[in-house]
Amino acid sequence: MARSKTSHNWLKEHFDDKYVKMAQKDGYRSRASYKLLEIQEKDKLIRPGMTVIDLGAAPGGWSQVTSRLIGGQGRLIASDILEMDSIPDVTFIQGDFTEDKILEQILEAVGNTQVDLVISDMAPNMSGLSAVDMPRAMFLCELALDLAGRVLRPGGDFLIKVFQGEGFDVYHKDIRKLFDKVQMRKPSSSRDRSREQYLLARGFRGIDGAASIERF
């Protein structure tokens, strides 16, 4: 009975959520679109003609926003473990990003192109136990940073969902070695009870002289 009540409360919160209603009205696949739109409004992160990688893309809310902003001259490579309905001019790679074969598929899709921006809204399935969830979340963050270090052009940018807890401070220090400017963002469209924040790193310096970050 308690579980049924919890499910009912979640559904009520979901459908009463103004961002869910806005997404339905505006044609976005998820409320997450407004998190990226809010960051974009503040930081002007995405520009026409850019090459972008979107990790944790399904159901496609961030990809929809990014595709519109980069326009026909831009290029977007998206990936998720879940299926995602196609979006025009978006290359989608389905698979588990923790597996090397999926990394290789992404790198193959990138080819010799230098990437302007890597964005990641990835998160593990949460158990509610911090001792379990934080290592899983940080593992995904490390892998996303590893990819960014491989593909970003000098001066490129990196936006990633993070959860503060064990391992975050070391991760934050690693990023500060690789980028000129690092800031935290908490969009108003992110639910108050959510521990998520977004780390925005700008001005990729390249890996020369910085700590080597190895893929696990």
Swiss-Prot record:
Superkingdom: Bacteria
InterPro entries named among the record's database cross-references: RNA_methyltr_RlmE, RNA_MeTrfase_FtsJ_dom, rRNA-MeTfrase_E, SAM-dependent_MTases_sf
EC number: 2.1.1.166
Catalysed reactions, as listed in the record: uridine(2552) in 23S rRNA + S-adenosyl-L-methionine = 2'-O-methyluridine(2552) in 23S rRNA + S-adenosyl-L-homocysteine + H(+)
Key words, A-Z: Cytoplasm, Methyltransferase, rRNA processing, S-adenosyl-L-methionine, Transferase
PANTHER family recorded: RIBOSOMAL RNA METHYLTRANSFERASE, RRNA METHYLTRANSFERASE 2, MITOCHONDRIAL
Family: Belongs to the class I-like SAM-binding methyltransferase superfamily. RNA methyltransferase RlmE family.
Protein name from the UniProt record: Ribosomal RNA large subunit methyltransferase E
Organism: Pseudomonas savastanoi pv. phaseolicola (strain 1448A / Race 6)
